[in-house]
């Protein structure tokens, strides 16, 4: 496949030691060589780095001191010639280098276009391409490992094997229908077809079993910290984040807005939401914060309910317990360094079988137990991202669910005695749906939409 030559800044914009401008295309080396003062880049071997300067051809002025990496097709990310220019970080210098490259007839790359070319040129499939963005956005080591496994093709291989099984079954059916006189080909009976289709459905279900945990590792657990004012919600957030992100004071109602922070809890990414203290209030600003807190609580995957060990339960406390019924929640009884005034038996009763953990955040007690409880709740205490192929992408989960239903329709049709040639339709559709995961049967408009979500220069 032939494309024009593209370029973009591949590092984050801002001040830094190094910035990288990436160029990809058949004539990438020749275009960069025009503005490079140093070795003739068209003569150097592939996968080598060269020192020199970028020069403005109009003024013959040296613009930047650079190191240039030359990587020749097909052993590159895009399977095209790639040049990467390492220059000093900073908005002015790196943008000037980019502008000089574009002046040589190179086009500014669209978001995700380098990865899109890697896909279109057969370097990676669509699920591997999507994993590139997952790797960039990974919040924990576990999430990073899941993305790397997908980039290396672990999910692709599973899907490929399923599609091959279906294809072989379809071919067998075709031979039976078109060439019934062939005695050396086993007859595809309803029983054999049910066995093969059931195997495919079971494998799809097995992959989908990892989807809840996979989605958590990819997107995090939306976790709302709720409680009356001054029970220690912001202190809990700070203890988990291990930095002073929220303002902590002894004045009730200090947190008037919703504070969000990602935190790594034993490999699980938590999107922590510290909410304004929920209570009746006449303060307009505080009341807005309270309403937003209630909204965030309803959207959360996990709720941490904080109550005060040194105070008796109030009607507001009990109302919070009623509000979280039906959700995953953990109760934190904070301030155990103070004299007890709370009725712990009542707390356990209101928790309705959910974990109750006592803490003294000021003395840094109870956080380890809380982190373990969170990991136990969602992963039964273990996360084996190295050996398990997690499916974490919502698009993949949707397609696998759809494929499972379609193959289920095929099994039902076979059991009801529908002619085998009619069952082919559902089998073929299942094969096509699974192909959408890897990009083998996907529409071009979807490809464009997926890659438009990537960052520029990737």
UniProtKB/Swiss-Prot annotation:
MF term (GO), any: metal ion binding
Entry binding sites for (6S)-5-formyl-5,6,7,8-tetrahydrofolate: 22, 84, 123, 458
Any one annotated GO CC term: cytosol
UniProt keyword Metal-binding present: yes
Positions that bind K(+): 230, 249, 251, 254
Subcellular location: Cytoplasm
InterPro entries, sorted: G_TrmE, GTP-bd, GTP-bd_TrmE_N, GTPase_MnmE, MnmE_dom2, MnmE_helical, P-loop_NTPase, Small_GTP-bd
Enzyme superclass (EC): hydrolase
Family: Belongs to the TRAFAC class TrmE-Era-EngA-EngB-Septin-like GTPase superfamily. TrmE GTPase family.
Protein name as annotated: tRNA modification GTPase MnmE
Phylogenetic classification of the source organism: Bacteria, Bacillati, Bacillota, Bacilli, Bacillales
């Amino acid at each position: 496949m032939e494309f024009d030559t593209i370029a973009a800044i591949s590092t984050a914009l801002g001040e830094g030691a190094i910035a990288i401008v990436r160029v990809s295309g058949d004539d990438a080396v020749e275009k960069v060589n025009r503005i490079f003062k140093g070795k003739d880049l068209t003569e150097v071997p592939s996968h080598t780095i060269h020192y020199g300067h970028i020069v403005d051809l109009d003024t013959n002025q040296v613009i930047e001191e650079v190191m240039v990496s030359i990587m020749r097709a097909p052993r590159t990310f895009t399977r095209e010639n790639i040049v990467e220019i390492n220059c000093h970080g900073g908005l002015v210098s790196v943008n000037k280098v980019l502008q000089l490259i574009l002046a040589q007839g190179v086009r500014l790359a669209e978001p995700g276009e380098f990865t899109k070319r890697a896909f279109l040129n057969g370097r990676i499939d669509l699920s591997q391409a999507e994993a590139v963005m997952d790797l960039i956005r990974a919040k924990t080591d576990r999430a990073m490992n899941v993305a790397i496994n997908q980039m290396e093709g672990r999910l692709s291989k599973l899907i490929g094997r399923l599609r091959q099984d279906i294809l072989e079954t379809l071919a067998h059916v075709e031979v039976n229908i078109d060439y019934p006189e062939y005695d050396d080909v086993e007859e595809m009976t309803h029983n054999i077809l049910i066995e093969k289709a059931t195997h495919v459905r079971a494998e799809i279900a097995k992959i989908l079993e990892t989807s809840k945990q996979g989605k958590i590792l990819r997107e995090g657990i939306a976790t709302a910290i709720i409680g009356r004012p001054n029970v220690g919600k912001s202190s809990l957030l700070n203890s988990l984040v291990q930095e002073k992100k929220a303002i902590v004071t002894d004045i009730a109602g200090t947190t008037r807005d919703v504070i969000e922070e990602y935190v790594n809890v034993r490999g699980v990414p938590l999107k922590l939401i510290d909410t304004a203290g929920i209570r009746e209030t006449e303060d307009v600003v505080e009341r807005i914060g309270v309403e937003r807190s209630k909204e965030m609580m309803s959207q959360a995957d996990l709720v941490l309910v904080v109550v005060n060990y040194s105070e008796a339960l109030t009607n507001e406390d009990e109302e919070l317990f009623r509000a979280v019924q039906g959700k995953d929640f953990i109760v934190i009884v904070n301030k155990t360094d103070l004299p007890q005034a709370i009725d712990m038996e009542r707390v356990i009763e209101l928790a309705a079988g959910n974990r109750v953990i006592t803490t003294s955040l000021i003395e840094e007690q109870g956080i380890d137990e809380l982190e373990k409880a969170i990991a136990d709740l969602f992963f039964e205490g273990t996360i084996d991202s190295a050996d398990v192929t997690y499916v974490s992408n919502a698009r993949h989960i949707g397609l696998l669910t759809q494929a499972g239903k379609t193959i289920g329709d095929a099994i039902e049709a076979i059991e009801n005695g529908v002619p085998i040639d009619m069952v082919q339709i559902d089998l073929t559709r299942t094969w096509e749906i699974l192909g959408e995961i890897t990009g083998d049967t996907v529409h071009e408009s979807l490809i464009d939409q997926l890659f438009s979500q990537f960052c520029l220069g990737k």
